[in-house]
Amino acid sequence: MISIPLSEELTVSADKLLQQHLLIVGATGSGKSTSAMTILHGLMAQNQTTMIIDPTGEYTHLPNAVVAKLGYNAYIDYEKLTGQDLNLLFGVDDPEIQEKLSDALDSLKIQKNIVKQPGVYTKINRTWDDFEKDMHQLYHYPQPVDLGLLPEQLRQEYAVPVDNFDVIGQKIDESGFAKCLPLIRRIKRLTSQQRFQQLYHMPLPEDEPAPANMQTDVMYLLRLFAGHRSDHKILVMDCSLFADNLAMGKVIVSLLTTALLRGKQQLKHSVPVTLLIDEAHRYVMAEKLTTNGIFRIAREGRKSGLFLMLTTQSPLDLPASLLGQFGHYLVHQLNTTSELTQLPVLQDYGQQIAHQNVGQALLAGNNFVPPKVIDMLFISEMNHHTTTPQFF
């Protein structure tokens, strides 16, 4: 049994603490990140696989950290993105346009790998039989596609027949294609940005110097850690280069968490993985919650041995349907009754929670009845580098 010391008096099993996910909440400076580090230290000491999604770079100096700084020494390989990933990446909500964008990606893959010609895959006057043969040949090819061709390929996806239904289309449905114009502007804007190109490892312009530092596919690291014991190491995915762009940060984290869940579900034999997402409220897409990677792990991850620890400043920052996926809470100081109403199990402890000292927390949930007040251990070597400026 894997046991985690939380305080001088209390040691709990990892199964009891984490198998129903753990939410760590508390006001800024109350000690929630330090508590998360104490738990991760207990897991690492016993060679349990742990990962952190770090929004600010605070955790990159932890001992034995394997640091993947996205946009610097790590990237998300655009060649491996699915149609569903592209829809998330470019913010497509309309189901019809989502389908067209996925089709456009498949078409460009056919053009690159089957037709082996530059440009787009034309669908005007192409027979359905020929298209089905091409699709049948299309498996996972290493040849990348040019995302810059997506706008032109999208137009081909609106080919419609006139009087010959053996072909995909004889003319372009221009009114249908016009619905894609906002998406096309978004694609052109994003794919022309250097930061976007570096993050997704897109081919750089000829006059652009290649990065001097070694770069690693972060999805490879995710698969590596998800399938093996970590040799007392911790994977830190540093998103700090995108801290100024919340929309891009949400997409990055959803792509990472979706890929991690997908990888865990495909592994026949894998190890338990604990994923800490610090300041999780930054990354939750409330309007697209069911497809958000964080929510999907909260709902589906346990069956695959994938367990969440989220830190956030207030339960009000998270949707109720996400809160409902957590069976356990580590609650540092909260100051308002409205916050406590989000977690009914805590309502009788409002005064206690409001007056807790830094580093004190209430451990509550299904396996901790009644809740326990604990003075969390401080592990000096796990001290994260806070970015809060100090007065002088």
Q: Where in this protein do the model-derived segments appear?
A:
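Active-site lining segments that contact anionic ligands and/or coordinate catalytic metals
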Residues: 19, 232, 305, 358, ...
